[in-house]
């Protein structure tokens, strides 16, 4: 999104604002979507959410040349409906493996794949940008989204009902000790990563090497 908005609109302020709409809407609504998956099953939620997100991303590519308000709103929809694949897969591991040692190994492997994607993704986006333009990373993202979302959904065997496990937790997650401190730490970390992402791309563009910005982000 930062690549696209900064290139088409030539504004890193708007790029940062658009990214903020995307991120904040995801942070607010993703737990609700996850709760729906617990209640109704992964497949019942992940398939429609994936479809909505793919369409919203196409909408983002449309509004980039039109309304700024529309761009921000559709970015919020993209963030709100982007499937949190890490949560889905880790939950599936925890429900499928009873042996704690094997579960720990599986979650460790999951973290390795997750972090690898986090590093490779920006570099790949920069590579596609250099070859096919600033819209190509989002088109590639849609392809990977559909493959991952549909693949995860159709291989799911749960049918929901897991929310009943937590019926006795009436105080809310913020009432759990240390969660508030953890939340503040994660907010600070998010601000650090988000601001540095925009700054790194801005510096790369100023140096005439915008296509290398993704690689710089990955190295960071």
Give the role of each language-model region:
Residues 1-27, 173-218:
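Helix-loop boundary and gating motifs at the non-cytosolic
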Residues 23-31, 118-119, 123:
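Residue-level signature of mid-helix packing/kink "hotspots" within the transmembrane helices
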Residues 28-42, 129:
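Helix-to-loop junctions at the C-terminal end of transmembrane segments
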Residues 51-66:
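C-terminal ends and interior cores of transmembrane alpha-helices
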Residues 76-116:
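Cytoplasmic helix-loop-helix junction between adjacent transmembrane helices
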Residues 85, 143-162:
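C-terminal membrane-cytosol helix-exit motif in multi-pass small-molecule transporters
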Residues 120-141:
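Transmembrane alpha-helix termini and helix-breaking/packing motifs in multi-pass membrane transporters
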